[in-house]
Amino acid sequence: MANIKSAAKRAQIAERNRLRNKAYRSAVRTLIKNYLNAISQYSTDPTPEKLAEVHHRLNLAFSKIDKAVKRGVLHRNTGARRKARLTRILNKTLQPAA
């Protein structure tokens, strides 16, 4: 335990921020999983409704990733890398098998 009042306060703030960041990272991971599930459902049975669901899930994941970057939960490059990977998965799925 910290002996100095300011150090104790910083420890308290760090713990608060850690929990907040943990919740944000969890939300990002959940939305990415939802997107990947939508992609797998679309790949097994490609219909326009499922494609719309895939795009909707992608938009939700992108939004949450961008907000996490803006709040400092994720590094800018990490957010860009995750978005690029999600886009690459979508493009690979939509590409006709050649």
UniProtKB/Swiss-Prot annotation:
GO terms for biological process: translation. SUPFAM superfamilies: Ribosomal protein S20. GO terms for cellular component: cytosol; small ribosomal subunit. InterPro entries: Ribosomal_bS20 (IPR002583), Ribosomal_bS20_sf (IPR036510). Keywords: Ribonucleoprotein, Ribosomal protein, RNA-binding, rRNA-binding. One of its GO terms (molecular function) is structural constituent of ribosome. HAMAP family: Ribosomal_bS20. NCBIfam families: S20 (TIGR00029). Belongs to the bacterial ribosomal protein bS20 family. Binds directly to 16S ribosomal RNA. This is Small ribosomal subunit protein bS20. It comes from Thermosynechococcus vestitus (strain NIES-2133 / IAM M-273 / BP-1). The gene is rpsT.
